[in-house]
Amino acid sequence: MSDASFDRSMPLSGEGSFGDYFALLKPRVMSLVVFTALVGLLVAPVSLHPMVGFCAILFIAVGAGASGALNMWWDADIDVIMKRTAGRPVPAGKVQPGEALALGLGLSGLSVVMLALATNLLAAGLLAFTIFFYAVVYSMWLKRSTPQNIVIGGAAGAFPPMIGWVAATGSVSLEAVLMFALIFMWTPPHFWALALFMKSDYHDAGVPMLTVTHGRKSTRTHILVYTVLLVPVALGLALTPVAGPLYLATALVLNAIFLKGAWDIWRRDEAQAEADKYATEKRFFKFSLLYLALHFTALLAEAILTRSGLWTFGG
């Protein structure tokens, strides 16, 4: 636990607006969850009624929002310390901790039950596990206890495309596993790049990020190693029926750029990084978001083109 002077049980006088309660759901994170889940659902080799697909994505989004609310409730004591998170609704006093907890628990139950009714029990079970893993295993345990928090905890963010696939097909396949693995392996370089230029925030909050426990030099090496391990996963998807030339070309370009970025980070020393205010690290972090989005966009584009009859590869 952090030494921050924040009590989750304390009453707060501020009345939150709709925007404050919506912010509890972490809409930016939710948008990535929704998109990757949508891709997982649409690239699946089955015919799905549009209403079933809509309901599946809606309830996956609700589940993601529930996870965000539970995370904000639990992390309020460290969020109040970190500049990047101090303005969140709970530490800012706009929403009471108990309200965030109630919203998170309520939406968790609703999303799991409704996804089971709309699709199948396996998809609902995966959603329930994802919420539990993020809110309990990652937020309450891993995040504050080990520098491997992001490595293990990254599984929570990697499940959405698998849930989308299972919602459509009712089973797990190699394609679903590789989409999961793509996000899972991408997560450490993405967040460690952030930690390179936000080290002081994590240190002050008592979060044992790799930069805090092992230093920036070790973190740079870890970023390069995990990026190298990420490349075959990304390219491996091109060998499955859901991908084709478009995805392969996209993946080759993106991974070449990503590898170059990781190499540039590894070569830098702290004097260089401080001199340009971590410009290379910030650029790598921003590109990592585009990297993931474009991989899934390429998968989605191939699925749409194939089903429309305009594309003869993949699918």
Swiss-Prot record:
Stored Gene3D superfamilies: UbiA prenyltransferase
Pathway: Porphyrin-containing compound metabolism; heme O biosynthesis; heme O from protoheme: step 1/1
Catalysed reaction equations from the record: heme b + (2E,6E)-farnesyl diphosphate + H2O = Fe(II)-heme o + diphosphate
GO molecular function: protoheme IX farnesyltransferase activity
One Pfam family matching this protein: UbiA
Stretches that traverse the bilayer: 21-41, 52-74, 98-118, 121-141, 150-170, 177-197, 223-243, 246-266, 284-304
Alphabetized CDD domains for the sequence: PT_UbiA_Cox10 (cd13957)
PROSITE patterns: UBIA (PS00943)
Annotated membrane topology: Multi-pass membrane protein
One annotated Gene Ontology cellular component of this protein: plasma membrane
PANTHER family: 4-HYDROXYBENZOATE SOLANESYLTRANSFERASE, PROTOHEME IX FARNESYLTRANSFERASE, MITOCHONDRIAL
Family: Belongs to the UbiA prenyltransferase family. Protoheme IX farnesyltransferase subfamily.
Function, in words: Converts heme B (protoheme IX) to heme O by substitution of the vinyl group on carbon 2 of heme B porphyrin ring with a hydroxyethyl farnesyl side group.
Protein name from the UniProt record: Protoheme IX farnesyltransferase
